[in-house]
Amino acid sequence: MTALIYCPFPDQGTAEKIGATLLEEELIGCINIGGSIRSLFVWNGERGEGTEVPALLKTHARLLDSVIARLEHLHPYEAPAILGWICDAAAPTTHVWLDGIGASRE
């Protein structure tokens, strides 16, 4: 089964570095890194705003919890927004591709 993870990063370089690490560790099959977005948020009871870089990571569902834990460890934010879910539907070729992710770790 295919799983996706959404996570914003402080900048492009950080997203690329962490994405490369997760690829090398065979935890993900792909990271799509977007352009800058404007974020408005509440943190520690105060309103804030800033620029972030969104990323969508693709993995196999059996690795979802491991990817989230590793991403949280690598991420520079104190409490990064990491949202993961199992896909209800995907192309069969996508399932086959991501089924091979992490196979050498098992």
Regions found by a protein language model. Give the residues of each.
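Positively charged, small/polar-rich N-terminal and surface patches that mediate targeting and assembly
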Residues: 1-106
